[in-house]
């Protein structure tokens, strides 16, 4: 599998609890932090749930 880099670009303040849990599971706790994960279906599904808060970095 390939890896993807995910960056949190918007604040989690005001986001529903389930979206905050997804950010925690991805390892994103602060703005502008970048994490690297394998591009598995579960990770891509989590990114889809919080796509308005994160960006995929090339």
Swiss-Prot record:
GO terms for cellular component: cytosolic large ribosomal subunit. It holds the Pfam family Ribosomal_L30. CDD domains: Ribosomal_L30. The keyword Ribosomal protein applies. InterPro entries: Ribo_uL30_ferredoxin-like_sf (IPR036919), Ribosomal_uL30_bac-type (IPR005996), Ribosomal_uL30_ferredoxin-like (IPR016082). GO terms for biological process: translation. One of its GO terms (molecular function) is structural constituent of ribosome. It comes from the Bacteria. The keyword Ribosomal protein applies. Keywords: Ribonucleoprotein, Ribosomal protein. Signal peptide: none annotated. Part of the 50S ribosomal subunit. Belongs to the universal ribosomal protein uL30 family. This is Large ribosomal subunit protein uL30. The gene is rpmD.
